[in-house]
Amino acid sequence: MKLTSHDIIRKPIITEKSMASMAEKRYTFIVHVDANKSQIKRAVEEVFNVKVESVNTINGLGKTKRMGVHVGKRSDYKKAIVTLTEESNGIEFFEGMQ
């Protein structure tokens, strides 16, 4: 399956820790599980029109949940922490949240 840039970036993560790291031009996203670092870098540069310096990824396993005797599982996820270059402006989407 060919992933487009909008398929790769699922949603931003808005937490106290991620908001504090925005001062250092680091932004956190939930991304597609099959996306690699180079695809994530290309997608962020294309969608937000910025230059990316580095991408760090974290794979999260979904928890097993029970409802009585029924057992289910939450979806696995991948988190990407994207660092922008010094000359790059911040991402406008996040500007009002600081």
UniProtKB/Swiss-Prot annotation:
GO terms for cellular component: ribonucleoprotein complex; ribosome. Keywords: Ribonucleoprotein, Ribosomal protein, RNA-binding, rRNA-binding. It comes from the Bacteria. InterPro entries: Nucleotide-bd_a/b_plait_sf, Ribosomal_uL23-like, Ribosomal_uL23/eL15/eS24_sf, Ribosomal_uL23_CS. One of its GO terms (molecular function) is structural constituent of ribosome. Pfam families: Ribosomal_L23. GO terms for biological process: translation. Part of the 50S ribosomal subunit. Contacts protein L29, and trigger factor when it is bound to the ribosome. Belongs to the universal ribosomal protein uL23 family. This is Large ribosomal subunit protein uL23. It comes from Clostridium beijerinckii (strain ATCC 51743 / NCIMB 8052). The lineage of its organism: Bacteria, Bacillati, Bacillota, Clostridia, Eubacteriales.
